[in-house]
């Protein structure tokens, strides 16, 4: 189970691209005699300086190390204000990060990764509304009961929030093959 994206968002890691494209000669037969054709070929980007590149690197490595294991991706949770000191103050998700992206782009990239790599995704943050599977959103005052401290840490789930996440995961995982 891989929960990813919130630290990449906070660090301002650029989203990047999933693939590079090149033109190559390839043998093909599409309703006619086989012949060499020039076709575009895509290759996964393996760039640790971009979010999508990092995802490609991580999933490739996990598939190599654990070929018989089910890999499950989790989207980032909603983000609200967090103040961890003079050098670590994180605005809520209504603000862009340092590379001009909203957290929604990181959530969407996790969903795309699931489609590209054939992996299940459990959505802890719906980009269309507040109906994520956990029902937890620190941007809603009444939901702060699930987060660490309403005064300075509306980012990390507290024990009650972690229990809710665990129950959500348990039921979602029951629907997936072993």
Show the residue positions of the predicted features:
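Alpha-helical cap/lid subdomain in secreted, periplasmic
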Residues: 1-177
């Amino acid at each position: 189970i891989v929960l990813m994206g919130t630290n990449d968002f906070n660090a301002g890691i650029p989203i990047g691209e999933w693939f590079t494209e090149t033109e190559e000669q390839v043998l093909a037969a599409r309703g006619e005699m086989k012949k060499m054709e020039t076709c575009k070929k895509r290759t996964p980007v393996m760039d640790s300086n971009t979010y999508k590149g990092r995802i490609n690197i991580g999933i490739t490595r996990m598939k190599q190390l654990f070929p018989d294991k089910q890999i499950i991706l989790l989207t980032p949770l909603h983000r609200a204000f967090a103040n961890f000191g003079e050098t670590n103050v994180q605005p809520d998700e209504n603000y862009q990060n340092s590379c001009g992206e909203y957290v929604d782009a990181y959530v969407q990239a996790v969903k795309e990764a699931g489609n590209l790599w054939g992996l299940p995704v459990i959505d802890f943050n719906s980009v269309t509304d507040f109906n994520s599977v956990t029902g937890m959103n620190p941007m809603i005052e009444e939901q702060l009961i699930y987060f660490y401290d309403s005064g300075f840490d509306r980012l990390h789930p507290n024990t009650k929030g972690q229990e809710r996440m665990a129950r959500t995961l348990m039921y979602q995982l029951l629907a997936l093959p072993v």
